[in-house]
A protein has these predicted regions:
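Conserved acidic-Pro-Pro-aromatic motif
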Residues: 251-338
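S-adenosyl-L-methionine
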Residues: 70-100, 110
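SAM cofactor-binding core of SAM-dependent methyltransferases
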Residues: 99-166, 216
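Short basic helix-loop element that most often maps to the first helix and adjoining turn
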Residues: 8-27, 52
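Recognition helix of helix-turn-helix/homeodomain-like DNA-binding domains
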Residues: 29-43, 66
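SAM-dependent nucleic-acid methyltransferase catalytic core
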Residues: 71-85, 138-256, 260-270, 285
Length: 346
């Protein structure tokens, strides 16, 4: 546990300071390969080596032993469009103070978990996903969720996967408990091909089996962190349209809009999470919503691809171009660096 904490802290501080492994290895008189293993938490490390690395990073050695991630909730599903990769960029533009936090296109909720707002309204059209989130509000549902996930882990096989996948075709599917629906969503997310959520035209999940002999559906420490956070906060969980989700937003509230992204002119970019899609007109409607919220005096931040349409729609607002890695795509070749924008009205 300690070597993972130290390794993770070394890596994070090094990246924050924008220095290479080669530089740290040279200054600390280490082999670069050894430093890489240390950062991965794969090797034991002496206090003398920690001290050398701390000196190379110009930080107090105690900083490398702090478990900064202890009890900090993180996304429990892998989700297309997830923001874990650009969290450091997003955090640069968070308002210093705000009242209620709104995230109407939640997905995995990377920014939501990173901010841990005391008051929040979270929403996603995917009712399966939001049932999983609702399990963290109720102790009985929470423990049942864990019980069901353990069962999925033990039964995992290709045949079992497809039997679980077909459940939403059943007429009485929505009579199931939130923990059963939530556990199904999480299991399918962990066991499916490439962690990709996709629905067919009828609204049924249709991603094939990922051919994993063993699946780990949950991290108990993270689940407990999420459960404790929800218990100590006022979180309203919805599964409705984004317009409905933000209708009560007021002055000094903070709204983060992370819609399905606009496509590039060459039609690249995985944006079809659900059966309804999100076309150019939907992007225009969202831009009007952005302006409406701005006129209310709310803080609004939006993420999207850096396309001509998005540049046109948000003229007059603060547009910052960043580079991000696309981590989930139906084709492995569709992953790589892409230009995104972070747009704010402040």
């Amino acid at each position: 546990m300690i070597k993972k904490i130290v390794g993770n802290n070394i890596k994070n501080i090094r990246k924050e300071k924008k220095v290479s492994q080669d530089y740290i290895a040279e200054v600390a008189l280490l082999d670069r390969g050894q430093l890489s293993k240390i950062e991965s938490g794969k090797v034991n490390i002496t206090i003398e080596t920690v001290a050398k690395i701390a000196q190379a990073l110009n930080v107090n050695v105690s900083c490398l032993f702090v478990n900064s991630q202890l009890n900090e909730p993180k996304p429990f599903v892998k989700w297309a469009g997830g923001k874990t990769q650009i969290l450091s960029e997003l955090k640069k533009y968070i308002p210093e103070k705000f009242n209620t936090y709104y995230e109407p296109f939640l997905g995995g909720g990377a920014l939501f978990f990173a901010l841990q707002p005391e008051k929040a309204v979270i929403n996603d059209l995917n009712v399966h996903l939001m049932n999983a989130f609702k399990c963290f509000e109720d102790e009985t549902a929470y423990h049942d969720l864990i019980k069901r996930l353990k069962l999925h882990e033990n039964k995992n096989s290709e045949q079992y996967y497809y039997s679980v996948r077909e459940q939403d075709r059943e007429a009485d599917f929505w009579k199931k408990s939130i923990s059963e629906i939530g556990a199904r969503l999480i299991y399918l997310n962990k066991a499916c091909f490439n962690g990709l959520y996709r629905e067919n035209s009828s609204g049924y999940f249709n991603v094939p089996f990922g051919k994993k002999e063993k699946v780990n559906c949950f991290d108990l420490e993270n689940f407990n962190a999420i459960f404790n956070y929800f218990k100590q906060s006022k979180i309203k969980i919805l599964s409705t349209t984004y317009q409905d989700a933000i209708k009560n937003a007021k002055q000094n509230d903070f709204i983060y809009l992370d819609p399905p992204y606009d496509v590039y002119p060459d039609k690249t970019g995985f944006v079809s999470y659900g059966k309804d899609g999100f076309d150019a007109q939907a992007q225009r409607d969202l831009a009007e919503c952005f302006k409406m919220l701005s006129n209310k005096g709310a803080y609004v931040m939006l993420s999207n691809h850096n396309t001509p349409l998005i540049q046109e729609l948000y003229q007059g607002f603060n547009i910052r171009v960043i580079h991000a890695k696309r981590m989930i795509n139906s084709k492995g070749t569709g992953r790589g660096a892409v230009e995104e924008v972070i747009i704010t009205n402040y």
